[in-house]
Curated annotation (Swiss-Prot):
The complex is composed of two ATP-binding proteins (HmuV), two transmembrane proteins (HmuU) and a solute-binding protein (HmuT). It is found in: Cell inner membrane. Belongs to the ABC transporter superfamily. Heme (hemin) importer (TC 3.A.1.14.5) family. The keyword Metal-binding does not apply. ATP binds at residues 57-64. One of its GO terms (cellular component) is plasma membrane. Part of the ABC transporter complex HmuTUV involved in hemin import. Responsible for energy coupling to the transport system. This is Hemin import ATP-binding protein HmuV. Pfam families: ABC_tran (PF00005). The keyword Nucleotide-binding applies. Keywords: ATP-binding, Cell inner membrane, Cell membrane, Membrane, Nucleotide-binding, Translocase, Transport.
Length: 277
């Protein structure tokens, strides 16, 4: 599917054929106004299981607010279903086993060791200590934080803390089965190049195993490389929704971000590369 002629206004460009998979989250008619600013404006979205969905858009577009509304951190008008059931009908305990949320900033001032922070993710699972430790070690290895295991959490760098919390939420949803949702708000913002790619590779692998993964990203090239679906948001509205090739059109990007770009093809992969003018 290709988009038709591009309008001059910020009319949403939406690929309505994209949602053919199992729907993990169905949100309809979301409205959110904070401080007099409309962050979500009659916002509808379905998030599919088995996909990485990247939320893109400029600062203040409503991306992080959408994640907070979907997970219940912020209340908004409208309806939200998780796997066909109203989110409010899920108990907190059940939701904790199936939904992992990585916020932009995680505050923890206690002098826990890094592995103890990761083990906190096992609290909802009601597993034995040995089982929890085994899962914890597996997830720490997955995101490359085993060497931080006995470091005090407050002594870690921002990127190290981010990876420790990623291991924690991976532990938390490790028993979710085929009803798993991960919401990652700028998970690569404090990471070096190698760990940016490692984090997104893990997200991609989880989606390939059936999880619904929603990621807020600012790096358009990382989104193009790892996401199955891109949803570009601005002014609380969806501006484009489709595959990387469909959504990352030069005129869309210039309208939304206010900056001209070139779109090229990656020399070794089937995804676009965005170059600034």
């Amino acid at each position: 599917m290709t988009f038709g002629p591009q309008p001059n206004s910020l009319t949403p460009l939406i690929n309505n054929q994209i949602c053919k998979k199992k729907v993990a989250i169905h949100a309809q008619g979301l409205n959110l106004i904070l401080g007099g600013k409309t962050l979500l404006d009659n916002f509808d979205i379905d998030i599919n299981a088995g996909e990485v969905t990247a939320l893109l858009g400029p600062n203040g577009a409503g991306k992080s607010s959408l994640l907070k509304v979907l997970c219940g951190e912020i209340e908004a008008t409208g309806s939200i279903e998780f796997f066909g059931q109203n989110r409010k009908q899920w108990s907190a305990k059940a939701l904790a086993k199936h939904l992992g949320v990585l916020p932009q900033h995680s505050t923890l001032n206690f002098a826990f060791l890094a592995h103890e922070v990761v083990e906190l993710g096992g609290l909802p699972l009601e597993l034995s200590n040995i089982q929890t430790q085994q899962i914890t070690q597996e997830k720490m290895a997955l995101v490359d934080v085993c060497d931080l295991s006995h470091r005090l959490y407050p002594s870690l760098s921002g990127g190290e803390k981010q990876r420790v919390h990623f291991a924690r939420i991976l532990t938390q949803v490790s028993q979710a089965g085929d009803q798993c949702v991960l919401m990652l708000d700028e998970p690569t913002s404090a990471l070096d190049l190698a760990h940016q790619h490692r984090t997104l590779q893990v997200a991609k692998e989880l989606a390939s195993n059936g999880a619904a993964v929603i990621i807020v990203l600012h790096d358009l090239n990382l989104a193009a490389q790892y996401a199955d679906r891109l949803v570009i948001v601005n002014h609380g509205l969806i501006q484009a929704d489709g595959t990387p090739w469909q959504a990352l059109q030069p005129d869309i990007i210039e309208r939304v971000y206010g900056w001209p770009v070139y779109i090229s093809s990656h020399p070794t992969g089937d995804f676009p590369v965005i170059l600034s003018h």
